[in-house]
Amino acid sequence: QRLITASTLAMGQKIIILDEPLANLDKDSAANLMQTLRSLAGAGYCVLVIEHRLDMVLPYVDSVYHVGSGKVEEIENKEEYLVSQTTKIEDFCPVFMGNKPLFDLNHVAFSVKEREILKDISCQIPKGGRTVFLGENGCGKTTLMRLIARLYKPTNGRIAQYIDEKFGQKTKANKKWYKKVGVIYQNPDYQLFMPTVEKEVGFGAESPEYAEKIAEFFGIKHLWNRHPQSLSEGQKRRVSIAAVVACKPEVLLLDEPTVGQDYEGLCKMMEILNKLHEETGNTMITITHDVRCAEALCDKAFYIENGVVAKSGGKELVREYFKG
């Protein structure tokens, strides 16, 4: 994302339009980009930013417009609007008391040729809990999640799983494994493959009725006959999550699940994910840079830096990370 944005800015065009440029950026990268855009605006450039991460955008802009219900309205009070769209979402789930591990990572490392991505990761993912991975862009969070999902194999170390002993510790991932382990990719385009939303959500669902129930939860039933690739990024994200949730996995791996969501949609998504978590007792593992919802998805948090777990904690670690 940084590469594409930098390439666009390097063209020297005087009118710059950016659609969700901060979607997957960590807080420092987002601040650097907005400072650059502010400098360009000061030099006479016209900069238009379409973005949902308003906490990162509003301090740098001159004018704000809200688009909704087919209308474009100018926002006069930026501070008031910021508060209404960025208030942290509360976590209404009971305090998690479990300590039995579902995944036990021991000295896990991963390299690609000469590039070392993860050096020495050791941590336990609690069964039935909600774990959040924090860290800057490029620190290896997505790689770590893919290792847990058995999409990659560690270069060194061991990841023990306690989902079901029949899967063993070295067994290759198969259809039965992914019935238990649901993966939400960072880019929904990578996992949407059916010709309609109905078929996408129903593909692995427990039943057609349950697929419809989940679609209603996520507010996508009206898109039932649409092709998934014809949808907006926010709609694609909701469809991709609904399709995996409809399979009732025991483990839900979410890589930047809130990309493209407005505040109302984000609140609804958190409500649904946590409600299903309470109902099913699933284990959730999330990567996010979204300060609005990180605490609402967290019982346990790990901060990844320089290829190792630099810090671990709970919601207090999430607050420390975003405050810093």
Predicted regions and their residues:
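Catalytic Walker B motif of ABC-type/P-loop ATPase nucleotide-binding domains
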Residues: 16-19, 252-255
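H-loop/switch region of ABC-family ATPase nucleotide-binding domains
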Residues: 51-52, 288-289
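The feature captures the beta-strand-to-loop junction immediately N-terminal to the Walker
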Residues: 134-136
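Helix-to-loop junction immediately C-terminal to a conserved catalytic motif
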Residues: 149
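ABC ATPase NBD Q-loop/coupling interface
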Residues: 158-176
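Conserved ABC ATPase "signature" region
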Residues: 208-223
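Conserved ABC ATPase signature
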Residues: 227-231, 235
